[in-house]
């Protein structure tokens, strides 16, 4: 269904969707608009005493584009057509966002519209809350459950807290984190904390934390010297 949002740049921003109640927001306030994953068309009405124009961030132009004029004078409108948010062979159809900036001709008044399209919620989580390894295990593999594509996994981040871990890396698909270290010849177990995270287009961060324990070296049993019992003196 085609929807209309009215923008009054000079004084207030008026938001109206269908027959819903209008919401009045003071000028220069950012506005968030959320639509379903389905393809559709969205229109924005603009009211200002003078000239105005609207622009879109470059990254969003792959799935969202303007139809008709993107500038005017006084009362006017601009229309946005957007694609369905679904798996396209590269992206899984995660939630996404386009950014529109409406600005008056003098450049002194502007409103930013965050145009958000619903989709799959990102998932990144370790398969276990903690991992325990023997003292002589020097390579650790930590599996990660994720619904991100290889392309999207490039924006995953991870952090290792544990100075005894000598090296680490994440696989290109974000499905595994590898840790390397030395044999633990110490008397105490070594503990590291690993966090993996992903921030989506809406600015929400999804994270998971796990604990890695490398056990201490087993203590060798003490060697006891076998003593012969003392010979008793014969009493006569």
For the regions a protein language model found, what residue spans apply to each?
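Bacterial Sec-dependent N-terminal signal peptides
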Residues: 15-37, 65, 205, 213-229, ...
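C-terminal edge beta-strand
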Residues: 107-120, 202-218
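A short beta-strand micro-motif common to beta-rich folds, especially ectodomain repeats
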Residues: 90-106, 188-200
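Exposed beta-strand face motif in extracellular beta-rich ectodomains
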Residues: 42, 76, 94-98, 140, ...
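Surface-exposed binding patches on compact interaction domains or structured appendages
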Residues: 45-79, 148-178
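Short, surface-exposed loop/turn segments at beta-strand-coil junctions that are enriched for proline
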Residues: 83-92, 182-187
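Sec-dependent signal peptide recognition
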Residues: 2-10
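Short, solvent-exposed loop/linker segments at the N-terminal edge
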Residues: 33-39, 131-137
